UniProtKB/Swiss-Prot annotation:
UniProt signal peptide: none
Name of the protein this chain belongs to: Phosphate acyltransferase
Organism: Laribacter hongkongensis (strain HLHK9)
Keyword terms of this UniProt record: Cytoplasm, Lipid biosynthesis, Lipid metabolism, Phospholipid biosynthesis, Phospholipid metabolism, Transferase
Alphabetical list of PANTHER family matching this protein: FATTY ACID/PHOSPHOLIPID SYNTHESIS PROTEIN PLSX, PHOSPHATE ACYLTRANSFERASE
InterPro entries: FA_synthesis, Phospholipid_synth_PlsX-like
Pathway(s) annotated for this protein in UniProt: Lipid metabolism; phospholipid metabolism
Family, as annotated: Belongs to the PlsX family.
Region Disordered: start-end pairs: 285-340
Reactions accelerated catalytically: a fatty acyl-[ACP] + phosphate = an acyl phosphate + holo-[ACP]
Keyword Cytoplasm annotated: yes
Self-association state and partner proteins as the record states: Homodimer. Probably interacts with PlsY.
GO cellular component terms given for this protein: cytoplasm
């Protein structure tokens, strides 16, 4: 069965400079997927021409005249940018022309737009940003990672339900364990919201492990870790910074002299395997222990997220992305201008 995905081609810090090459690469590896690139046709076509590669019949362009900027408020995006690439991509899902949408755009605007257009399932107040993070034991689902800065105990319970459902569908684990991120494992720790959420989780049908601490995220203590969006986002960005530092330090040490360069060459297979283990498994849908991309199967519909949020500074995986300005805003990549 062919899966159709609508891609917000203008989203992210670079826009079409990343999304279009990545889309072309993706189609080369996934013959059972169709992509709809949503955005400004001229910018998309110019990028396709620059790539100078045969155009797949599974790639189409859908026009959208507006772009949601990274500093647009969710309210402004909803009210004033109804023809944005983000909004149109999500509309295609609602209309049944696509089964899912992908965007690397403004997080707040994306969550607000998706909630407004697609709604939430009964019993769920707010959507949450979830991610599968690598751990010592495989991967764990962590949510919320930034969609909801302030949460009620009831919403944290809902996040637990969503996370457990997601990781069951992705990994095939039955009765996954759910932990509540806290400053200590003892029941007396945490603020009132966390304590009340723990009580709700404990009395639910979920396999509630109890409170977990920050170090448990990567130890793989539980299958699902629940937290509010503020704490989750700080934890995620801290992890990204640490990973960047470790990578940079390794590069410096291996490049110190001829002997260390030769050592790096000898260690290359180990380093590649190490990097592979750390790569996010979030898009590797698993069924029967194997990634769905190898099986040509679509995730079960009732457990399938309808849209994906990508990192705003995400880059194409193959050749390095050149310095470019965003075609919709004319601005260089935020936070990494001049970087190669």
């Amino acid at each position: 069965m062919t899966l159709t995905v609508a891609v917000d081609a203008m989203g992210g810090d670079v826009g079409v400079g990343v999304t279009v090459p990545a889309a072309v690469d993706f189609l080369d590896r996934h013959p059972d997927v169709r992509l709809i690139l949503v955005g400004q046709p001229d910018a998309i076509e110019d990028e396709l021409t620059r790539l100078a590669r045969p155009r797949s019949g599974r790639l189409t362009v859908h026009a959208a005249s507006q772009v949601v900027a990274m500093d647009d408020s969710p309210q402004s995006a909803l009210k004033n940018k109804k023809d944005s690439s983000m909004r149109v991509a999500i509309n295609l899902v609602k209309e049944g022309q696509a089964q899912a949408a992908v965007s690397a755009g403004n997080t707040g605007a994306l969550m607000a737009t998706a909630r407004f257009v697609l709604k939430t399932i009964p019993g769920i107040d707010r959507p949450a940003i979830a991610k599968l993070l690598p751990t010592m034991k495989g991967e764990s689902c962590v949510l919320d990672l930034g969609a909801n800065v302030d949460c009620t105990p009831e919403q944290l319970l809902q996040f637990g339900i969503m996370g457990a459902t997601l990781i069951e569908g992705v990994t095939g684990r039955n009765n996954p364990t759910v932990g509540l991120l806290n400053i200590g494992s003892e029941e007396i720790k945490g603020n009132d919201t966390v304590k009340q959420a723990a009580e709700l989780l404990r009395n639910s049908s979920l396999n509630f492990y109890g409170n977990v601490e920050g170090n448990d995220i990567y130890l793989g203590t539980v299958d699902v870790i629940v937290t509010d969006g503020f704490t989750g986002n700080v934890a995620l960005k801290t992890s990204e910074g640490l990973a960047h530092m470790v990578g940079a330090l390794l590069k410096q040490e291996f490049g110190r002299n001829l002997f260390t360069r030769l050592s790096a060459l000898a260690a290359l297979p180990v380093l590649k395997h190490f990097k592979k283990r750390l790569d996010s498994p979030a898009l590797q849908w698993r069924q029967s222990g194997r990634p769905a991309r190898h099986r040509g199967q679509e995730p079960r519909r009732h457990r399938q997220p309808r849209f994906w949020l990508c990192h705003r500074r995400g880059r194409r995986r193959s050749p390095r992305q050149r310095n470019r300005t965003h075609p919709g805003t004319g601005q260089p990549p935020a936070g990494c201008a001049g970087a190669r």
